[in-house]
Structures are given as C-alpha cells and as structure tokens.
C-alpha cells in the first residue's frame, strides 16, 4: 500500500471477521493503535468449507497456508446432459473458514493489534475530536466507552456498526451446503458445478476438501426452500449428508461507499458489511481482503485508495455478469456449454474469476457468439436482480 501520511491514529475494529482481522493487521503493521472487539468469548467460528482463487495466496502470503485444505486443478460443468471441463492454470484453493479466521487473528496480534473477545458493540457516539465506541463485556454486562478517531465495521452482513452510522440494511441470500463422502469417480482436485435454473438462478457445487469428502452446496433465494432443494439434490445424486453448514451472504446491487463522516471521526465498512461480494458467484473472501487493503490504504493515505476504485470496477462487472445469467433457462445453459470451444475453455482456465474483465474479454475473443448469448440474458429480465425479492 502506498501512503502519504505518517501520523498515528487510534482505530477500533468491530467484528472478528476475515476482512476485519486482515484490516487490523495491515494497520497495526504501520504503527496504528488498533483494538478489535469481538462478541464471542472464544474465537471458534462455525466451520465452513470455501473455495477461493489463487489470488488469496498473493494477498496473504504465508498467512494463507494454515487454512488451505486442498488445491483444485479443474472444473467440470454440467447442464442437461452436457458437460465441459476447464483446466486451471493456477489452482483454486479449498479453505476452512475457522482456520482462516484463527490464522488471521494470530497475524493481527503479532502485528500489534489488541483483540478483545467477549466484547459486544453497543453504540457509537460523537466524542470531542473523535468517536466513542460503547462496548459491553459479555461476562458481566459492564460497559466501557473507548475513544478513537476511526471505527471499522467488520461485523458482517447484519453489521450493527453500519446501522449505527446510518447505512441501510443489506439484502442477503441463503447459502446451504452439506458435507458428504466424495463420489468414487470424482478426483480430489476437481470441482463439479451443476446449473439447474428451475431450482436456483445460481448453481450447485461439489468441492472436495480431501480425497474422501467434500461440500455439496447451493445458493438460493429462500432459506427453507433452499435447504429442501439441497436435500432433494443430495437424494438424486445418492449422497448422504454428514453435516450441514449455512450462512446468509450479502447481495451486491451497487457500490456501497465504505466511509462516512461521523462527527469529527470516520466510520468505515469492510467485507460483508459493505457487500464486497462477487454477485456472479456469491464469493466474498478475496474481494473482502481487497476491501481491507483499500480501507487500510484510505486510512493511511488521507482517504485516497486506488484499491477501492479498482474493487468497485470489479464488483460492478460481476453485477453485470449476474444480470446476464440470472434469468437463464436450461436451454440457455446448454447453449453456453455447447459454445465453449477449446480456445474458450483454455482462456477460462488461464484467467482468474477475480479478474473478470480480463477473463470475459479473452473468452469472448475466442468465442464471439458468447457475447450474443450474454446480451440475450440481459434482455430476459422480466424480473430483475436489482429488485429485492426478485
């Protein structure tokens, strides 16, 4: 990160999320006084198997390794009896969320951040030259007012910091996945994706976390209905769920400005609290880390951040992709798979999902008819992803 200011600031980070902890480490390394407030007594978040691009390694460096369970070398796409295989030039990573957060917490503390567990955010007030964060100690109910110049909300899609500072609530969608035995015919370095638009405008996935088990999941639009659809899909694939995992994921509909002036202080949002999620795939780990890089850069650089501008362009393009795909029918996905010639598949494997402009440009150069299919998807919007509940 490039910076131009060198004065020390006091920062309170609310929420021990991946993005919040990464922001804490970035600022603490630059000499900023950072206190992290997390309501749980022990940093043992719910386990969840996730897939990310290799870009996470370049962002976190060695800090990523402890959370990596497996590497993915290819994707298999299925729709209505058709299939396509995409070989990846750089492997995707299967990670475990709990291990990731615990590793980031260790890194933040080593960098100088102070993590205070069992501390629940209660309120935000103006306080002279800065802000006062009111924190409630979960053990005994006592409260403390902490004076800081900057507050960062890293407390997820239902961020209480965002509500206190005046941001509107976010819309979310349900993610449900089941841990299952890996099918005997499935290599451990391969992800399978099924497009079933009568069930979901997104897709089903099966990601292997080891040679013997994986996570089969789906994103839907209604929580109970999504769980039911997943159970039916498991039955159809003859897979038995060993356990279920779930979450509510924010839906990116437009760029959310990440900073607000609050009295004489500043409030920032990172990660899910700012809906920094690729809405094409509902993936938010790498984009959340980019949001953390941008917020840290802005705090250290007088509000200026090139990273945030680049992230906005990336998220807006993923929104365009989602608008194109959201109302695809089975025949459209079949046509999409049929259009994936060898040069197009090669380009898909060479470019990262976290560089969507480059990926789509190269793929469409190899198969121009994909442009017409995408435009048709944009014109099929009898109901729009931009409308809540659509």
Model-derived features with residue positions:
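N-terminal FAD cofactor-binding segment of flavoenzymes
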Residues: 39-76
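Predominantly flavin-linked oxidoreductase catalytic cores and closely associated redox partners
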Residues: 30, 107-242, 275
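Glycine-rich FAD pyrophosphate-binding loop
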Residues: 12-14, 25-47
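Beta1/beta-strand and adjacent pyrophosphate-binding region of the FAD-binding site
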Residues: 4-19
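Dinucleotide-binding Rossmann-like beta1-alpha1 core, especially the glycine-rich loop
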Residues: 41, 82-103
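Active-site-proximal substrate-binding core of FAD-dependent oxidoreductases
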Residues: 296-337
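FAD/FMN-dependent oxidoreductases across multiple families
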Residues: 123, 222-299, 304-309
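C-terminal auxiliary extensions adjacent to catalytic cores
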Residues: 333-390
């Amino acid at each position: 990160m490039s910076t131009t200011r060198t004065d020390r600031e006091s920062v309170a980070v609310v929420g021990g999320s991946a993005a919040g902890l990464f922001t804490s480490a970035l600022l603490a390394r630059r000499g900023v006084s950072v206190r992290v407030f997390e309501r749980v007594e022990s940093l043992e978040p719910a386990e969840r198997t996730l897939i990310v691009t290799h870009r996470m390694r370049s962002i976190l460096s060695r800090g990523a390794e402890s959370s990596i369970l497996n590497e993915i070398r290819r994707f298999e796409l299925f729709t209505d009896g058709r299939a396509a295989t995409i070989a990846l030039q750089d492997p995707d990573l299967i990670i475990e969320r709990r291990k990731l957060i615990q590793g980031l917490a260790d890194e933040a503390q080593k960098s100088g951040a102070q993590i205070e567990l069992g501390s629940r955010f209660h309120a935000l007030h103006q306080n002279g030259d800065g802000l006062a964060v009111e924190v409630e100690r979960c053990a005994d109910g006592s409260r403390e007012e902490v004076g800081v110049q900057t507050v960062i909300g890293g407390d997820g899609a239902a961020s209480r910091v965002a509500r206190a500072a005046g941001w509107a609530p976010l819309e979310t969608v349900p993610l449900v996945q089941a841990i299952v035995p890996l099918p005997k015919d499935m290599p451990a370095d391969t992800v399978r994706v099924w497009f079933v638009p009568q069930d979901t405008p997104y897709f089903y996935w099966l990601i292997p976390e080891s040679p013997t088990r994986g996570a089969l999941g789906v994103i839907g639009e209604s929580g109970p209905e999504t769980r039911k659809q997943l159970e039916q899909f498991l039955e159809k694939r003859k897979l038995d769920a060993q356990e279920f995992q779930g979450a509510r994921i924010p839906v990116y509909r437009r760029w959310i400005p990440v900073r607000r002036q609050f009295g004489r202080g500043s409030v920032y949002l990172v990660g899910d609290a700012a809906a920094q999620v690729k809405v094409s795939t509902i993936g938010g780990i790498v984009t959340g880390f980019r949001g953390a890089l941008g917020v840290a850069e802005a705090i250290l650089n007088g509000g200026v951040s090139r990273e945030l501008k680049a992230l906005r362009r990336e998220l807006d393009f993923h929104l365009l992709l989602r608008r194109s795909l959201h109302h695809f029918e089975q025949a459209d996905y079949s046509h999409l798979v049929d259009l994936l010639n060898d040069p197009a598949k090669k380009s898909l494997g060479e470019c990262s999902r976290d560089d969507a402009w480059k990926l789509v440009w190269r793929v469409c150069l190899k198969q121009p008819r994909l442009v017409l299919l995408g435009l048709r998807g944009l014109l099929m919007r009898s109901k729009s992803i931009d409308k809540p509940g659509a």
